[in-house]
């Protein structure tokens, strides 16, 4: 017998998702190749093959495989993989166009809170697609459109963290509190998710079969499934039943199994449709296909019915939440014989009666006319049994489990179709059936009392679960708000605020590598290298293999002139990953500290080869070119850094430095101001602007910049020194003396400070103090002896030496 085409592809898809979920990418790729060979024209096979190529790092192959369906927007999965490959390959416009053409397939999707250990959605939702679209626009230098995409993604899913990070990198102003707050949409989604969890866990109390309502037809081996959702009970109306369901019942191809949950499924396996609703295959190789279900075994002998030891149940599927159509006991089996017989070839694995008719389902929702439907049943219409007696599988119910269900039916109460079940079991439980019919009045009383108790318990559990879920979501939102606020402040170089926010986190969240690294970066941006080193040391101790932010750590060690630790860090990072740009930056900084600029340049070039978007690597190249006085090459390196990241202020600072050395003061001032616009709290950049203005004989404007720098960094020796010098040029000697006295206490061993004090006392005609400070400067810096001696010899001269030693 030739196997079903749909079942072969279904099994292959199930195996592919199994290996993907277990991170066995090579196995998944091989199986995806088999599926694509079996169904070369289907978009689903192309999507899975392209996805496996992408998981294996074969970006070009993923791009080629997904191009046919992805570039046209014919399949959402193909378009998504195609766009991801385009992002890596630099084909940004192609990826953007592909996502735009598939917009109708993802614009209404929202899978937030629909993923768990047992559920998955293998196709992306709107938030994921918008985030990818934002990355493509950002790489294409269309920052406004990128911001729109990131904002839309965060509105749908505030936990799309990389969308928030990229939004911060664009430099746009944000109100973080508006992102991480409990919106009505979030509240609704988390409440519904909590309700589903309750429905999947609540087990009705023991009692007659009428009280153990099983609204999910997929859990009843005798129920013919239907794909239509949210229909009401017919309560005996055969005409309404046929109006709602049509002349035939819609089931999966060949009747291999019940329908899957609307919102997700257990793994292994995955929804193969492009919508959230389950779809079935038509068997001709088109894109309409069933979810990957395992077919039930057929041709079991009649002896199986009498088995006392059924096979172990496969993993349970989540209930679908689809309300099944029901029949009442007033509907005769003979009235539907022709319809059931017409379904026989598709429901070949279902139980049949002795006469050969397909067994009708036991009624899941309707009871006797005298018994009203329970409120708890209406509220929770997806109860998943957890006992062995009534559990079954959504991946194809085996006969062993069916028999157990039948025996349970016989031992307990009977629904309104008890006559049908009696024929199915061929008399095995007729005695019990008679007993049940004799005790109808007792059944009614038991049903009523059990229904009230179940209703109260279910309602209380639902309220409790919803409350706990909302509280948990509020806690996570508050955590994300704090972390996001800290990162946003750091991206705006409000370093003190960032440190304060990160420090306010709970100890468990604060003492993590990522948070500690951000605090270290904040201290680094403030030029507080000793404090920054302390945090990076803790990061390295917690995560020895961490590469992120290690280029900053190596620069901190370079500033601290800690050659030994810098060399050790470089060796450690190379052992972790020789192909990481951070490792090569650390090696380059080590060579730079040893004044081996050529070797340092080679290392920094290697870093940018490994990652062409690594802006800091280009900036470090520029610094080395400046050290070698190769200014033209330095300009090219800094411009490459700006091209990689337009908000990388270090590259703008480098350009200003080069133009300053070349004597192009106007260009230098412009680039220093560009850098200060990005990082307005950096005192060094403000001092650079003041220095250029001072060289342009504009000491008043320079003094304004120096005052601003001293306000930003009160402990900055450089800012206070240049402020004192500007005051001396403006003949404000008393203010200059005040600044220098403070500076002397801050840096008592700085020769330039004592030299400037000597000059100031000379201007004040205080020769004693002038000689004292000149002598101190001479002792601290013997290399500047010539300058200091000339100043001491000119004590009696009225001419003022405007030069300093630096």
From Swiss-Prot:
**UniProt entry keywords in alphabetical sequence:** Cell cycle, Cell division, Mitosis, Nucleus, Repeat, TPR repeat
User: Basic and acidic residues compositional bias: what residue ranges?
Assistant: 328-348, 432-445
Output a single Gene Ontology CC term carried by this record.
Answer: cytoplasm
Ranges of the TPR repeats in the UniProt entry = 76-109, 127-160, 513-546, 581-614, 616-648, 649-682, 684-716, 751-784
| Pfam assignment, any one | ANAPC3
Biased composition regions of type Low complexity, renumbered to the chain: 246-257, 446-459
Q: Could you provide one GO biological process annotation from this protein's UniProt record?
A: anaphase-promoting complex-dependent catabolic process
- Which intervals carry biased composition (Polar residues)? 224-237, 408-421
Identify the stretch(es) annotated as Disordered. Answer: 202-348, 353-372, 401-460
Protein's UniProt keywords contain Phosphoprotein: no
* Annotated localization: Nucleus
Q: Where is this region: BimA domain?
A: 260-399
**Keyword Ribosomal protein appears in the UniProt entry:** no
Q: Which PANTHER family match?
A: CELL DIVISION CYCLE 16,23,27 (PTHR12558), CELL DIVISION CYCLE PROTEIN 27 HOMOLOG (PTHR12558:SF13)
Please give the family membership noted in the entry. Answer: Belongs to the APC3/CDC27 family.
Role of this protein: Required for the completion of mitosis in Aspergillus nidulans.
Q: What is this protein called?
A: Protein bimA
Q: What is the lineage of its organism?
A: Eukaryota, Fungi, Dikarya, Ascomycota, Pezizomycotina
- Which gene produces this protein? bimA
